[in-house]
A protein has these predicted regions:
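Bacterial N-terminal signal peptides
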Residues: 8-16
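Bacterial N-terminal signal peptides that target proteins for export
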Residues: 1-7
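Eukaryotic scaffold repeat domains enriched in small/polar residues
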Residues: 20-390
């Protein structure tokens, strides 16, 4: 039996979505909605504010500098940042295998962690998250480890290693982590549970002991396993009600899932380029020997996702295609390479926010602060205030 598809008129889309949002300012001509099996598919044509920005980023300062002579002013390969309720800033170092804590004036307060495999140690950490109360922090590395803000280790569990697919598998494995209520976490699912079957299980929820609770996340299918893994790498975040927001790194797709793992909406938006994910044959030479390899060729769409205090979805979108290292050359102006697209909790594109011209690899949002983490160039973290435009 074919899925039942209900195409909503723009007027009824406005009534159904804006009505539940208690927001009468939505222009229904700027998006369309269709409903299939209870899931809303939102097609954004333009941002609600057009080309007018809805916010700007005000630089408050920078933590870490290459020219520093004292250890307190140096960050060793920072990869993530978070903000505690009192304004203190936590920065996760991959190179230093530790978490450093700074006050709101960017002065170092304390640090904890070391490289190793023991309880509270880190091995190639990539992600730092706070729980809903922001009184527990979780570090993603070869394990998931839970700490108090003062660095007291409270427990954790081992992660399944993504052994196959080389750099693609590594990118998928370290694409993110989200913390839910009840000390549960969302992690990328091991390819073994979805890749061969094509089951919709991109992400998995685990309890505090590492027991799998459930898996969810729509998979776009391809014939080549490497391409299917690559094209389905996702960035994700969770709100205070345990809804999960999933942005596909190499697809024009942003999904919202209920706490039970049911899809609520799937949204897209206009891009400046065509999304084309294919398998290409490349020739590798070593001396007189030549070998042909099939390798995925994908279009970069989304670099990251986060939620602000108004439960809006900030998606970091590529304006142009990056180099093979997923970054841009030094001569590039980053303002012209990436931008933030801000959606409401129903998938409607509200406005866009221009990036400052600084290179970075990761970002996070807490309260009215946005952190840009640069591990490749300046080894620093930039702190910005999000200033709303009326």
């Amino acid at each position: 039996m074919k899925p039942r598809i209900l195409a909503l008129s723009l007027v009824s889309a406005l009534v159904s979505i804006a009505g539940c949002r208690n927001d009468s300012a939505v222009d229904s001509t700027l998006f369309a909605v269709e409903v299939m099996d209870g899931v809303r598919y939102v097609h954004n044509f333009k941002a609600q504010r057009g080309e007018r920005p809805g916010a700007r980023l005000e630089l408050l300062g920078k933590i870490g500098t290459l020219e520093a002579k004292e250890n307190k002013d140096i960050l060793y390969d920072p990869v993530d940042a978070a903000r505690l309720p009192d304004g203190d800033i936590l920065i996760l170092e991959r190179g230093g295998s530790c978490v450093k804590r700074y006050d709101e004036n960017h002065r170092l307060i304390s640090a904890f962690g070391q490289k190793g495999q023991g309880p509270g140690d880190f091995a190639n950490p990539f992600c730092l998250r706070l729980d809903r109360g922001r009184d527990r922090l979780y570090v993603g590395h070869s394990r998931v480890s839970r700490f108090t803000p003062d660095g007291i280790y409270e427990g954790g569990f081992n992660r399944e290693v993504f052994a196959a697919f080389g750099s693609i598998g590594a990118e998928s494995e370290t694409s993110g982590m989200s913390v839910l209520s009840g000390a549960r976490v969302i992690l990328p699912s091991p390819p073994s549970i979805w890749l061969d079957s094509g089951a919709d299980k991109l992400l998995s929820v685990y309890d505090d002991k590492g027991t799998l609770i459930r898996s969810f996340g729509a998979v776009k299918r391809y014939d080549d396993p490497g391409l299917m893994l690559n094209a389905n790498i996702v960035k994700f975040a969770a709100d205070a009600d345990d809804n999960a927001y999933v942005a596909y790194a190499y697809q024009n797709r942003i999904d919202k899932y209920s706490p039970e793992g049911g899809m609520i909406f799937s949204a897209d938006r206009p891009l400046r380029y065509e999304v084309r994910n294919v398998t290409k044959v490349e020739i590798f030479k070593s001396g007189a020997m030549e070998r042909e390899f099939s390798w995925p060729s994908v279009s970069s769409v989304t670099k990251g996702i986060s939620l602000d205090r108004k439960n809006r979805i900030w998606v970091l979108t590529f304006l142009k295609q990056p180099n093979r290292f997923l970054t841009f050359d030094e001569a590039e102006n980053w303002t012209e390479c990436l931008e933030f697209e801000v959606f409401d909790a129903d998938g409607i594109l509200l406005f866009k926010v221009a990036l400052p011209d600084v290179p970075f690899g990761n970002f996070s949002i807490y309260d009215d602060r946005l952190y840009l983490v640069d591990w490749r160039h300046e080894s620093c973290v930039y702190e910005y205030r999000i200033v709303e435009d009326n």
